[in-house]
Amino acid sequence: KRVCVVGGGNVAMDATRTSLRLGASHVSCVYRRRIEDMTALTEEIEEAQAEGAEIKTLFAPDHIEADENGNVCALWVQPQIISDVSSDGRTNVKNADKPLVRIPCDYIIVAIGQSIESKHFEQSGILTKRGAIQAEKSCFVPGSKNVFAGGDAVSGPATVIRAVAAGKVAAA
């Protein structure tokens, strides 16, 4: 079977590598920015490629094609170009003036985006910035009484190891 994984983070790399290990004949990991913009760890990307994954960058999903039985048969993607770089150094993309590209596949795994619901924290007086809780290195949340935060809620998408380490710091 052929698999398309959509995303550029560690979960996307896990899905890509797991698909290969479970016997997929071809796995394409589709990401809308450049490979250097992926949030996955560099070694995860390199290991996925070493295992046979194809990393297709600067492509944004457009629509899924199904066969006459309703089964997935392709992912159509829109080529992207870099439009500019934001003040935080992140590249922004826009649609390229190119036709859609068809990527044949039997399965699509969507592994994009994760965020915390920060509204409730903000309403409780806990400072957030771009959806992440603002905490000190000790994991203490300034302006709160005995509130500590760590893991993805503070750093954004990262590894479980980092989240566990933050828990140990907060408990100390």
What are these regions (language model features)?
Residues 16-63:
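Rossmann-like dinucleotide-binding cores of NAD(P)H-dependent redox enzymes
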Residues 54-56, 76, 148:
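General small-molecule cofactor/ligand-binding pocket signal
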